[in-house]
Amino acid sequence: MPFIYINILLALTTALLGLLLFRSHMMSSLLCLEGLMLSLFIMSALTTLGTHHTLSITMPIILMVFAACETALGLALLVTISNIYGSDYVQNLNLLQC
């Protein structure tokens, strides 16, 4: 396994560990999710470059589109939670309340 794949797997693991450890604040969870998506994008782009298939070129682009949608929804949710509750704690996000 090349050295760059080991670095990307380490970044992916660090982002996942950060998501598990810092899940009390919404902003830190969103940052860890972005790191996770960026690591997945780089890994899929490098894999696509290594395979030389023309049909697999669109996979990293589609992944970035989903990452941008996730970012927009996450920031909208963060702004809504901050305006309603005054903080960005994930525990304020209770979907069972009316």
UniProtKB/Swiss-Prot annotation:
InterPro entries: NADH_UbQ_OxRdtase_chain4L/K (IPR001133), NUOK/Mnh_C1-like (IPR039428)
Keyword Flavoprotein applies: no
Assigned GO CC terms: mitochondrial inner membrane; respiratory chain complex I
Molecular function via GO: NADH dehydrogenase (ubiquinone) activity
Catalytic activity: a ubiquinone + NADH + 5 H(+)(in) = a ubiquinol + NAD(+) + 4 H(+)(out)
Transmembrane segments: 2-22, 30-50, 61-81
GO biological process: ATP synthesis coupled electron transport
Protein localization: Mitochondrion inner membrane
Topology within the bilayer: Multi-pass membrane protein
EC number from the UniProt entry: 7.1.1.2
Keywords: Electron transport, Membrane, Mitochondrion, Mitochondrion inner membrane, NAD, Respiratory chain, Translocase, Transmembrane, Transmembrane helix, Transport, Ubiquinone
Catalytic EC class: translocase
KW Transmembrane helix (keyword) present: yes
Pfam families the UniProt entry points to: Oxidored_q2
UniProt similarity note: Belongs to the complex I subunit 4L family.
Protein task: Core subunit of the mitochondrial membrane respiratory chain NADH dehydrogenase (Complex I) which catalyzes electron transfer from NADH through the respiratory chain, using ubiquinone as an electron acceptor. Part of the enzyme membrane arm which is embedded in the lipid bilayer and involved in proton translocation.
PANTHER family (alphabetical): NADH-UBIQUINONE OXIDOREDUCTASE CHAIN 4L, NADH-UBIQUINONE OXIDOREDUCTASE SUBUNIT ND4L
Quaternary structure and interacting proteins, as annotated: Core subunit of respiratory chain NADH dehydrogenase (Complex I) which is composed of 45 different subunits.
Protein's UniProt name: NADH-ubiquinone oxidoreductase chain 4L
Organism: Bradypus tridactylus
Gene name per UniProt: MT-ND4L
